[in-house]
Each structure stands twice: as structure tokens, then as C-alpha cells.
Regions:
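C-terminal alpha-helical interaction appendages
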Residues: 176-186, 190
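Conserved small/polar residues in nucleotide/adenosyl-binding loops
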Residues: 198-202
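Internal nucleotide-binding/catalytic subdomain
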Residues: 1-104
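Hydrophobic side chains in beta-strands
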Residues: 5, 82, 141-142, 172, ...
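Short, well-ordered beta-strand elements within core beta-sheets of diverse protein domains
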Residues: 38-41, 140, 189-197
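FAD-site-proximal beta/loop scaffold in flavoenzymes
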Residues: 170-176
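Active-site "cap" helix and flanking loop/linker of ATP-utilizing ligase/carboxylase catalytic domains
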Residues: 54-76, 93-165, 178
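Short, surface-exposed beta-edge/turn micro-motifs
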Residues: 1, 134-137, 190
Length: 202
């Protein structure tokens, strides 16, 4: 389970949970990747997990960094493994996750600029961070052969289908404009096709 957070050096505000799928192929098969898809919220991030992490992980991390003389402001990504003994922290990242951000941020009600300014100013405790009571899913379109060898330079078509469609997003990653102004593939993970859902049962 992935959990993103905003931090202002003292206060930490937790965003909604997300669940990443790392394997390159369907059915949880193939090599590990940077993430082939994600959805938010994660059904495995229960109230019990949330309470445990708020007590032992989130604020404790912020307090420890401050105690070491390096208070942190920005975004902290918590990569959690849920075990019979309770949640374990597998990794920290000082950034948004990809594709976690693609499914968490569309659900956020707050203006992200207000939240960032609060992180900078040390006033995050005054922000009531809220998320829509819905779900969001992102499927990554990857180049054939990823995460090993793959070709680049293939034209990407069909993007016009996302125009003026509320709740649908197309996030670019491994893409670029070629010399003719066409958008072509330029990496392994090319696009994140994302949709807001009214229910996670959909």
C-alpha cells in the first residue's frame, strides 16, 4: 500500500491511500516495473492500519527528522507492507509516487497551491485536507518490451477521445513531440489512462 503525505516540518497531513501494481504483465506476472497501474483508495488500508501508522509511523518520521536537525518540508511517500504483525515501512520517497499521484490528486478537494504554500509557511495545521468519496484508477500504457528493451518514436493517436470528458485524464510520461510536431513514444511507461469512479465496486 502506498500513502502520500504533505509535511511542513512539524505537521503531517496524510492523503488518501493507493495500491500500486508493479508486475509488467497481467495476472501479477512478469518483471517488476515502476508501476503498471494504481487505484485509490486501497481496500487493504483499513481504519486499523491507518490508526497504527498515525501512532507509530507518520508523525514519528517527521519528528525524527526534526530531532536530527533536518526538518522536512514537502511530500513524503510511505511504501507500506501489510503483515500479520502489522504494517511495515518498506521505503520512503521525498516525492509523489508515479502512478500514485495520478489516482490520489484527482480525488483531492483542496487547491494544491494552498496546500503547498502551507507546507512552505509552516501552517499545514490550518489545512483541512479532504478527498472525494469516490475511487480513481490509472492504467499505464507501456512500450512493448518494457521494462527491458523497447523501441521509441511511435506516433500516439486517439488522445482526442479524452477531450471534454469529465473525470477522464491522460497523463503523459514517456512521450515527446517529434520534429514534425507529432506526439510519439519516448520511454517505457508512456501514458497513464486515468478515470474517476463513483464507487470502487465499478
Amino acid at each position: 500500500v502506498s500513502v502520500l503525505s504533505f509535511v511542513d516540518g512539524n505537521t503531517i497531513k496524510i492523503m488518501s491511500s493507493a495500491q500500486d501494481h508493479k508486475r509488467a504483465k497481467d495476472g501479477d506476472q512478469g518483471l517488476n516495473t515502476g508501476g503498471m497501474g494504481n487505484f485509490s483508495p486501497s481496500p487493504f488500508y483499513t481504519d486499523e492500519v491507518d490508526a497504527f501508522c498515525k501512532k507509530y509511523v507518520y508523525q514519528a518520521t517527521v519528528d525524527a527528522m526534526k530531532a536530527e536537525g533536518r526538518p522536512f518540508k514537502g511530500v513524503i511517500f510511505f511504501g507500506l507492507m501489510l503483515t500479520p504483525e502489522g504494517p511495515k515501512v518498506l521505503e520512503y520517497n521525498a516525492r509523489f509516487g508515479d502512478p500514485e499521484a495520478q489516482v490520489v490528486l484527482p480525488r483531492m478537494k483542496n487547491d494544491i497551491i494552498d496546500v503547498f504554500e502551507a507546507c512552505i509557511d509552516g501552517t499545514l495545521d490550518q489545512i483541512d485536507l479532504q478527498f472525494e468519496d469516490n475511487a480513481c484508477v490509472c492504467v499505464v500504457l507501456a512500450s512493448d518490451g518494457y521494462p527491458l528493451a523497447y523501441e521509441k518514436g511511435f506516433e500516439i493517436t486517439g488522445m482526442e477521445n479524452f477531450k471534454d470528458k469529465d473525470g477522464y485524464y491522460l497523463f503523459h510520461a514517456g512521450s515527446k513531440f517529434d520534429e514534425n510536431g507529432k506526439i510519439v513514444t519516448n520511454g517505457g511507461r508512456v501514458l497513464g489512462v486515468t478515470c474517476l469512479l463513483y464507487t470502487s465496486d465499478a
